[in-house]
Regions:
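Positively charged, low-complexity terminal tracts
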Residues: 1-130
């Protein structure tokens, strides 16, 4: 069996689903970080700023208020953009006072944990497939 067919056979598909309020938290977090990167010249790696910005731009065009079936919608970001979002959550939780957070600390922490879990699953599946 060719390696390509073997990979195809072993590939398991996983999807991340976020409720609309989680999409809103994600949008707010990314908007906050992108705004600070440009306004304040925050010293974060260029690749993180870039993927956070591209994720933010995608979310600007994603209708966060539409009623999805059962209130669930698939998240429209790439893995790189989700990594940028995870980094954004961590950055904001560590460096911002509560009164400057775009959402509550609990909401941002819950989103960070969900992103971390999702990206860990992707890593595990990628490792299994090689």
């Amino acid at each position: 069996m060719s390696r390509k067919n073997k990979l195809k056979r072993n590939r398991r598909s996983i999807t991340v689903q976020f409720t609309n309020p989680e999409c809103r938290v994600m949008f707010n977090v990314m908007e906050c970080l992108v705004s600070d990167v440009y306004d304040l010249g925050v010293d974060i790696p260029a690749i993180i700023a870039s993927v956070t910005n591209s994720g933010y731009e995608k979310l600007k065009n994603y209708n966060l208020t539409d009623n999805m079936p059962d209130g669930i919608g698939e998240f429209p970001l790439t893995v790189k953009e989700m990594c940028g979002a995870l980094y954004s959550c961590n950055w904001i939780l560590e460096d911002y006072d509560d009164d400057l957070l775009p959402n509550s600390r609990e909401e941002i922490s819950a989103l960070r944990d969900k992103l971390d879990n999702y990206l860990s699953q992707i890593l595990a599946i990628s490792s299994d497939s090689v």
